[in-house]
Amino acid sequence: VLRNTLAPGTELMAVVKAEAYGHGGAVTARTLQRAGVRAFAVACLAEGIALRKAGIRGTILILGYTSPEEAPLLTRWHLTQTVADIDHGRALAARGRRVHVHLALDTGMHRLGILAENRKEILEAFRLPNLVVDGVFSHLYVSDSLEAEDVAYTQEQLTLFYDTVAWLRTAGYDPGKVHIQSSYGLWNLPAQPCDYV
């Protein structure tokens, strides 16, 4: 059902954190992988490793914080780490291990990421040695609501996010996989130009 609503070129990234919300992380991920899903998101390093041990291929994005001391495990298990803020990015880079990351951009939730308006820190994150930025993302935290105030706020988040992505491209940086929508956003705001939903 979700696939039928995706814009051309958009893939599903299945969020299977917390044992797929109680349904069994590995079982759910294997079923989705057989159905063609090639990207997954988890809450923490242990969940990512568990999926790899269960035979899950493709991208596995860790949405939560991973201690920089555990960077070798990110590399060993071919996991992609969210950069929680610029200090986290600096600390990961300082470990001297090549780590694939997605950069979280804070477009208003104020829980995770570099402020989308802070272009100096965003550029620094892209320039950090040992970090391979494979994507940028944010979270539309009221996209499940159709209240006028929430719709307006979601639109502000989208504008800020896509303006930042466009600025990165103009500055000569490839943002990689771009993702901001959840399934709620997909229903309420179809056809956004995303690589993942």
Predicted segments with their positions:
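Positively charged, low-complexity intrinsically disordered leader regions
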Residues: 1-4
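Active-site-proximal beta-alpha core segment in soluble small-molecule metabolic enzymes
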Residues: 7-180, 192-193
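Short, solvent-exposed loop/turn elements at beta->coil junctions and helix N-caps
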Residues: 183-185
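Active-site loop ensemble at the mouth of alpha/beta enzyme cores that anchors a bound cofactor
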Residues: 187-197
